[in-house]
Amino acid sequence: MPAELKLQAFGAYVRAAFGELPYHVGSSLENKTGWRDVDVRVILDDDDWQRWGFCDPDYVGHRDEKWIALCLAFSALGREMTGLPIDFQIQPQTWANKKFRGMRGALGFVPHSFVGDVPVYDPAKLKSAALSPAPATAERSPQ
C-alpha cells in the first residue's frame, strides 16, 4: 500500500479523535529526500484548545502531561500504521498560524471504517463528538 494512503488512513483516526483535519507539514511534505521524520499536526480552534485544557503553547511540550501523552500516543499509532517516523503534535490555531507559515497538506480523507458503502462515522458530528464527555458506564459486578 502506498505510504500516502497509509498516512491518509492514520489522518482519518486523528480526525475522528479531535474533530479537525490533521495536516502533514515540514520537510517531508516539501522534499522527497533529506527529512528525518514526518510532521503531522492537528490545529485546534483556540476555544477548543482551551476546552481540551492544554497550557500555554510556548511551554506545552515541557509542562503539559495531557498534551505530551496524546502526542506520544498518536506518534506511536502513526508509526505503527504507516511505518514512517511520525512526529505528531497538537497546536492552537492562532499560535500555529503566527509561528508556522509553510505548506500544509490535509490528511484524513480516507475513511478508516466502512459498513458497506457508508462510513460508520458522520464527519459533520466529529467536532462536537471529540469534545463530548465519555458516556457513563455501569459498574461491573465482581465475578
Q: What does each of the following model-derived ranges do?
A:
Residues 43, 57-59, 87-89:
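Active-site ExK catalytic segment of metal-dependent nucleases
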Residues 1-5, 24, 32-35, 52-57, ...:
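N-terminal regions immediately upstream of nucleotidyltransferase
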Residues 15, 36, 41, 51, ...:
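Arginine residue identity/basic-tract feature
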Residues 64-113:
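Conserved catalytic core of two-metal-ion nucleotidyltransferases
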